């Protein structure tokens, strides 16, 4: 029970910290994953030259999942290997409209810079 209570407390602290960011910024834009997409049939990916479990790619989205912040991932080009790269746009609590508007603008400005690679 103690661990659960600590997790709730940590979650509340994270929510407060993220909310403070939006005193200054309307949106946050950051990588969706720490590198290009990995192949769907692969259980590992390479980060900084090291093979790691593919599930580690989710670590950039977890804080915003915990805080309940509205977010969306948008294609943002291709790697030198032809794999898609994405960014996530995160907004204020309950401000999905701003997040989706920004995502639509970013996607529209990236015409021709993204295509679904074979096998995806």
Task: Tell where the protein language model's regions lie, with residue ranges.
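Serine-dependent amide/ester hydrolase catalytic core
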Residues: 1-66, 116-119
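Structural helix-boundary/capping segments
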Residues: 5-6, 16, 65-120
């Amino acid at each position: 029970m103690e661990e659960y209570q600590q997790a709730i407390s940590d979650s509340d602290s994270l929510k407060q910290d993220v909310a403070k960011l939006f005193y200054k910024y309307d949106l946050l834009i950051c990588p969706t994953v720490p590198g290009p997409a990995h192949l769907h049939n692969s259980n590992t990916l390479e980060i900084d030259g090291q093979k790691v479990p593919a599930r580690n790619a989710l670590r950039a989205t977890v804080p915003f999942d915990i805080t309940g912040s509205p977010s969306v991932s948008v294609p943002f080009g291709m790697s030198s290997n032809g794999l898609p790269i994405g960014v996530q746009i995160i907004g204020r609590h309950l401000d999905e409209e701003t997040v989706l508007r920004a995502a639509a603008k970013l996607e529209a400005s990236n015409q021709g810079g993204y295509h679904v690679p074979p096998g995806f």
